[in-house]
A protein has these predicted regions:
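Soluble FAD-dependent oxygen oxidases
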Residues: 1-454
Length: 454
């Protein structure tokens, strides 16, 4: 391969620098790493891998908790140098390269008081998050990341670059919005932008774990009438000392409520005030803040490459009183300091106003998303934490809709977690047909895989 970017093997200087990924359990050991400088490099890499029968993993931001952004013994196509973000403020669109992080996008769009709905961690890759759904601080007002994709440039399994939009390859466009990395290497995405920021109302309040049931109940009750402008979450964890965190919570278990208002900051602080009075806080850092700062506020919770992680999720419609008691019990018995008792994301709003068949992402009725995030450091604790997450998920399963959020899916090859079909529901058949058209041999299978028909 004659590339403008780098080609690295395990014997090359620099290989060790690009090998690690988000989850320390899954660093991967690729035989070849292609550090792509542009679309031409991606095309050459795909053609080479196809001709030499190499299993391919694609890394945008490298934030896959399941380790899908690396591979053992195959080829890793690393898009890290491709981080360009072009904003057209008059048209309210942004063209984003496949290796960009959400922090890159926020910096460029916020210069114009605009936002592309992204995640809640600035270090997350844009493409991976958006292709799997994308649930961030603007989700209830402006929808998921995938709902705001206007077009994509995709290098497919045959090595051809295709544009996918509502008017061109519309079947591929439909599948990309929720179908993940099944259909090719996405080298760029064009997003619709919306007015938000540069200052937004932010709620960040930390309560004692002893008040978990009271706080979750208050969060539930408030969420029932919350306006679409508010996107919020409630969770329990413990964090070590960090300059970005208030000292009152260093090494102290807490329940945190995070919320952002997509509108006038003064109005937002009033609307979210009840979330600050659910119990006596350990500390309350709620205030109007720059949106770029809010996007980075949860970065210390999810530090790249330092933790071993195993997560499971589910969508639910209601938080019952019985479920609140279960949430509080799980908050008190977490198996490791950095494990999250279920993060409860408030969904609904604009998300649920999209027809389930309009995009591959089909969960359009749930009011909440639960994510049980096991995070730890010592490999000797692998089985303990993984078992706790699985058992906890099983206890909550009766409350679930049957679907999971695929971006929060771990160990994608384990049989008990093979829930892709349940998640896509009635869209699964159509996805398999699109897969057969653009990737009939399942060349791109290092993902939450969709099997091609035929």
């Amino acid at each position: 391969m004659a590339l403008r970017g780098q080609v690295l093997t395990p014997d090359d200087a620099g290989y060790a620098d690009v090998r690690p990924a988000y989850n320390a359990m899954h660093p991967g050991s690729p035989a070849i790493v292609v550090v792509a400088s542009g679309t031409a490099d991606v095309i050459d890499a795909v053609n080479f891998a196809r001709e030499h029968d190499l299993l391919v993993a694609v890394r945008g931001g490298g934030h896959s908790v399941a380790g899908l952004s690396s591979v053992d013994g195959g080829m890793l196509i690393d898009l890290a140098p491709m981080r360009g973000v072009d904003v057209d403020p008059e048209a309210s669109i942004a063209r984003v390269q496949g290796g960009a992080l959400w922090g890159d996008v926020d910096r460029e769009t916020q210069a114009f008081g605009l936002v592309a709905p992204g995640g809640v961690v600035s270090d997350t890759g844009v493409a991976g998050l958006a292709l799997g759904g994308g649930e961030g601080w603007a989700r209830r007002k402006y929808g998921l990341s995938c709902d705001n994709i206007l077009s994509a440039q995709v290098v497919c399994a045959d090595g051809k670059l295709r544009t996918a939009s509502a008017d061109t390859n519309s079947d591929l466009y439909w599948a990309l919005r929720g179908g993940g990395g099944n259909f090719g290497v996405v080298t760029s995405l064009t997003f619709e932008l919306h007015p938000m920021g540069p200052i937004v109302a932010f709620t960040g309040v930390f309560y004692p774990v002893a008040d978990a049931a009271e706080v979750w109940r208050g969060f539930r009750d408030w969420s029932l009438t919350a306006p679409d402008e508010v996107s919020a979450l409630c969770a329990c964890t413990t964090l070590p000392a960090h300059d970005a965190l208030p000292p009152e919570i260093h090494d102290t278990p807490f329940i945190v409520i995070g919320a952002v208002y997509s509108g006038d900051p003064d109005d937002g602080m009033k609307v979210m005030q009840p979330l600050r009075n659910l119990a006596t806080p350990l500390v309350d850092i709620s205030q109007p803040l720059p949106f770029v700062g809010v996007q980075a506020a949860f970065d210390p919770f999810f530090v790249r490459g330092t933790l071993r992680s195993y997560w499971k999720s589910m969508y639910i419609n209601d938080i019952t009183d019985d479920m609140i008691e279960l949430l509080a019990r799980k908050a008190a018995e977490r198996p490791s300091m950095r494990t999250f008792a279920p993060i409860t994301f408030l969904m609904g709003g604009a998300i649920n106003r999209v027809d389930p068949e309009a995009t591959a992402y089909s969960e359009r009725s749930a009011n909440y998303l639960l994510s049980i995030d096991g995070n730890w450091s010592d490999p000797a604790e692998d089985q303990k934490v993984i078992s706790w997450v699985r058992d906890t998920w099983a206890e909550f399963a009766p409350y679930g809709t049957g679907g999971v959020y695929l971006n929060f899916r771990s160990l994608a090859d384990e049989s008990e977690d093979s829930d892709v079909e349940n998640t896509f529901g009635d869209n699964m058949r159509r996805l398999s047909e699109v897969k057969a058209k653009y990737d009939p041999t399942n060349f791109f299978r290092r993902n939450n895989n969709i099997t091609p028909t035929g």
